[in-house]
């Protein structure tokens, strides 16, 4: 499929003998995951997204599990361990002009207003109050709060972010 997909979850280890698998949501909540509609799966070591035939998604305590259709034992389920679950990009809500999806920030180069490089965004830590950009440059790692106060500009098309931040903050 040539559509762009957005990863919303990752499948972990098998959970029960009947083929249930651990599901690790990449969204804020299971309710958000369920609201996206049709899910697709990308098996490990492939670049192909296929429509997912899920039987059920279960939440027990703070864990989430998925049962795939026609998978009835742990041995068969093992081939899905580390698979990605995604949705077509068009299924995501339209963002306001000043909003971005955190996943779109990954891979952006980050420089400050003095043109000092902080490297590339490799991860984002969600603190509850705001996101924090995790930037890597050579052997250094920089944590930069993702708040309007410090973000001077973003150009996601050219994957560049300019920040009002210094190395010694």
Curated annotation (Swiss-Prot):
Q: Which GO terms describe its molecular function?
A: ribosome binding
Describe the family membership recorded for this protein in Swiss-Prot or TrEMBL: Belongs to the RimM family.
Q: What's the protein called, per UniProt?
A: Ribosome maturation factor RimM
Q: Looking at the UniProt record for this protein, which Gene Ontology cellular component terms does it annotate, in alphabetical order?
A: cytoplasm; ribosome
The record comments on the domains as follows: The PRC barrel domain binds ribosomal protein uS19.
SUPFAM superfamilies, per the entry: PRC-barrel domain, Translation proteins
Biological process (GO) annotations held by this record are:
ribosomal small subunit biogenesis; rRNA processing
**Coarse class of the protein's main subcellular location:** cytoplasm
Supply the alphabetized keyword list.
Answer: Chaperone, Cytoplasm, Ribosome biogenesis, rRNA processing
The chain positions of domain PRC barrel read 96-169
Q: How does it assemble?
A: Binds ribosomal protein uS19.
The domain of life is Bacteria
Spell out the subcellular localization from the entry: Cytoplasm
| Role summary | An accessory protein needed during the final step in the assembly of 30S ribosomal subunit, possibly for assembly of the head region. Essential for efficient processing of 16S rRNA. May be needed both before and after RbfA during the maturation of 16S rRNA. It has affinity for free ribosomal 30S subunits but not for 70S ribosomes.
């Amino acid at each position: 499929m040539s559509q762009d997909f957005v990863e919303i979850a990752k499948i972990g280890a098998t959970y029960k003998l009947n083929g249930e698998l651990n599901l690790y949501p990449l969204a804020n909540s299971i309710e958000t995951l369920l609201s996206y509609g049709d899910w697709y799966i990308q098996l490990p070591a492939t670049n192909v997204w296929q429509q997912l035939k899920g039987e059920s998604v279960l939440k027990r305590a703070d864990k989430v599990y998925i049962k795939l259709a026609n998978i009835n034992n742990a041995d068969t389920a093992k081939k899905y361990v580390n698979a990605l679950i995604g949705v077509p990009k068009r299924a995501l809500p339209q963002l306001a002009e000043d909003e971005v999806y955190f996943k779109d920030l990954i891979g952006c180069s980050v420089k400050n207003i003095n043109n000092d490089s902080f490297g590339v965004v490799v991860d984002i830590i969600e603190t509850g109050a705001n996101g924090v950009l995790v930037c890597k440059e050579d052997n250094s790692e920089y944590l930069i709060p993702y708040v309007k106060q410090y973000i001077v500009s973003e150009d996601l098309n050219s994957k560049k972010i300019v920040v009002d931040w210094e190395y010694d903050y």
